[in-house]
Amino acid sequence: MQRIMLRAKLHRVTVTQADLNYEGSCGIDQDLLDAADMKEFEKIELYNVNNGERFSTYIIKGERGSGEISLNGAAARRAHLGDQLIICTYAPMSDEEIAAYKPKVILVNEKNGIKEIKKF
């Protein structure tokens, strides 16, 4: 049996840009992507801490070191500049894989810089 498990989480990142007229997606600083082992075009689930909205989209690479968290297209309607988001990826895993796996959680500072990397 496969279970859908948390793979990685960017915890309480701050929205820095929203562009309703862009094609879609979420731009994420390359440093955050590397730390969380998230890949461009990977599906993500986003949870808005400020208003409770929950939605999904896909990743595009943001400029390294920029602190960018940009919501594009329809996703731009789900959050405002300055809102805090939790961004997660999930993966199907067998019970054997789960026994040895630990998800990554990236904690950030007020500028979306990496503050701490946790493995649970």
From Swiss-Prot:
Which residues does the Swiss-Prot or TrEMBL record annotate as the active site?
25 (schiff-base intermediate with substrate), 58 (proton donor)
Which family would the database say this protein is a member of? Belongs to the PanD family.
Give the gene symbol. Answer: panD
Instruction: Tell me the protein's name.
Output: Aspartate 1-decarboxylase
Specify which residues bind substrate according to the UniProt entry for this protein.
Answer: 57, 73-75
Subunit structure comment from the entry: Heterooctamer of four alpha and four beta subunits.
Q: Which modifications occur after translation, per UniProt?
A: Is synthesized initially as an inactive proenzyme, which is activated by self-cleavage at a specific serine bond to produce a beta-subunit with a hydroxyl group at its C-terminus and an alpha-subunit with a pyruvoyl group at its N-terminus.
Which BP terms from GO are recorded? alanine biosynthetic process; pantothenate biosynthetic process
Instruction: Offer an example of a GO molecular function term for this protein.
Output: aspartate 1-decarboxylase activity
- Which cofactors are required for activity? pyruvate
Q: Which UniProt keywords apply?
A: Autocatalytic cleavage, Cytoplasm, Decarboxylase, Lyase, Pantothenate biosynthesis, Pyruvate, Schiff base, Zymogen
